[in-house]
Amino acid sequence: MTSATRSQVLSLYMRVFRIARGWQSTLPQDTESERRYIVQEAQTLFRQNQQLTDHTSIKKCIDECEARIEIGLHYRNPYPRPLYLPIMGLATQKGRKLKAQQRMRKQAKPVYLQSHDEDS
């Protein structure tokens, strides 16, 4: 990781904590739990991706973080937006059709959910 990339990642990490510190929920009783969620989510995802060394995968994670920040601030919602599967995305198939479904699901996954598993 270059020093420029490292400083960009660290500034994003600190930006997330600054956002969490000043976060105001639309419902006042949920403010504290949403602040905790923002901090825990940032810690989890940054630790999960700290071993990355490939520049393109690091760039994807940076783009994901920036997208999550912008979406969260715009909608005033710290939780990831739901993922809608394409048509025929859940039908059970076998062989080539199954591979096509898996490819459709992967292509339909937005940039702000790349670090999340399909099961979670």
Curated annotation (Swiss-Prot):
Family statement: Belongs to the complex I LYR family.
GO CC term (a single one): mitochondrion
Top-level taxonomic group: Eukaryota
Organism (species): Salmo salar (Atlantic salmon)
Gene responsible for this protein: lyrm1
Protein name from the UniProt record: LYR motif-containing protein 1
Signal peptide as annotated in the record: none
Chain residue ranges for the region called Disordered: 101-120
Coiled coil (UniProt feature): none
Pfam hit, one: Complex1_LYR
